[in-house]
Amino acid sequence: MEIKLKFLGATKCVTGSSHLLTVNEKKILLDCGLFQSNDLKSYSNDILNVDPKEVDYIVLSHSHVDHSGRIPLFFKLGFQGKVICTEPTKELCGYLLKDAARIQQEETYFENLSRHGKGVKALSPLYDEEDVELALKSFYTYGYNEEILLGEGIKVIFRDAGHILGSAICEILIKNCGESWVKLIYTGDIGNINRDILNNPEKELQGDFLILESTYGDKMHEEKDNYAKLLEIVKDIMEGNGNLIIPCFSLGRTQEIIYMLNSFIESGQVQGCNVYIDSPLAAGITQIFRKYEEYFDKKAKALIEKGDDPLNFKGLHFVENSDDGKKIYQVKSKSIIIVAGGVYDGGRIANHLRNNLPRPECGVLITSYQGNQSIGNKLLKGNKRIKLQGENIEVKGKVYYMDGLSGHADKAGLYNWVSSMKEKPKKIFLVHGEGKNIESFTNKLKSENYSVVIPDFLDEFPLEIN
């Protein structure tokens, strides 16, 4: 029995998750993600480092494109195997991968415009929406705690990762000599604890080898009451008859904020307020959440049993086309506008910021990390003027920040999850982390006598049990 593990992405970086497990002649890819942002300076999405025709299965931990985003490219290049995932992951991939295809086409179009007439070869997107549709036909779905056979002597079990809807910790069991099994656990992304809607990550697992994410291996999340903080912000703006703009992720964070706003509005703590979700993508994803209520935590299920849909309330409006979106630009008061994505110099968010930042009764709530040169960072630093699409905008509105909504476990959460294992793994491979985060968490684990490796790109290791 020969078992090897090769790291094809998310090594000393946080995108491009892809790890090749070879068991004798069978090849199983654990995630197949896109490299994004700064990681594209070092890695190329069209260099796969494995022949898709030789891969038998892709085991997908969750739908985020840094874990799923190259799957359509694999099919385009000859992959004929199966993608194994949970049902919500498949449905969410339908939205997120098509969105990724559209973004690629737009970026390629503008890049080719800049290349025109310079004698430089035109680029092509990695895949299009038709490629996504074809790929989705080969997604096979399973629930948590089911045994999934990947051929003789290999099985997979999904456990709830608590990161996003349908996210999974992947247990891979491989029949060894005699009656023994080799167990590899791949965490995907481990969720933060005590979040709304989702369960906490399943703990107390056991494995011989562990591939562990380390996104926030050197960070502790704020221990503040998210409800109290958001309620204070909403009341501050609504009592002044202003608008609150909230740029945030379409998947996960938008639904968490809707859930909290539902609590405020249905309890009467906030009155006379309209909430607009200005994102067709977020609207579609919220419908998927409603479809898979069995994946919710006990508190959310209890609300539903009482007849309260926690993702719907009077005054909640989903914007599903550009015409409706333009109408929101005219909204002047007592409205919360949730916009997909980050604080960018373009698109819907730029229009909302332009309309509301010059007004002292309005505000913007930032809920995620902002890069040093970003517009969001400039707002947090208190800049009184920002430039949006070439226009100088005076900032008179309020700027708020909430750091307690992360979907990733922090340093303590990661360590608590690892230390809940019944026995120490023989080896831990730390991935999906960079710089101080991965180094600090490595030191923490080693100080507790764990055997830890930080793999480099394309490193390969035998998984041997003596």
Give each language-model segment a name.
Residues A10-T11, C32-F35, P88, I164, ...:
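Active-site metal-binding loops of divalent metal-dependent hydrolases
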Residues A100-I164, E293-K332:
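Metallo-beta-lactamase
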Residues K82, I169, G191-D278, G363-S368, ...:
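Cap/insert and terminal regions of metallo-dependent hydrolase folds
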Residues M1-K53, L134-N199, D323-V331, I336, ...:
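Core dinuclear metal-dependent hydrolase active-site scaffold
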Residues T11-G16, V23-G81, C85-K137, I190-N200, ...:
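Pre-active-site segment of Zn-dependent metallo-hydrolases
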Residues G16, N38, S68-G69, G94, ...:
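Short helix/loop capping segments that flank catalytic or ligand/cofactor-binding pockets
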Residues D99-I103, E107-E111, N226-A228, L261-F264, ...:
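Short secondary-structure boundary/capping segments
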Residues I233-N372, K387:
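Hard-cation-handling environments
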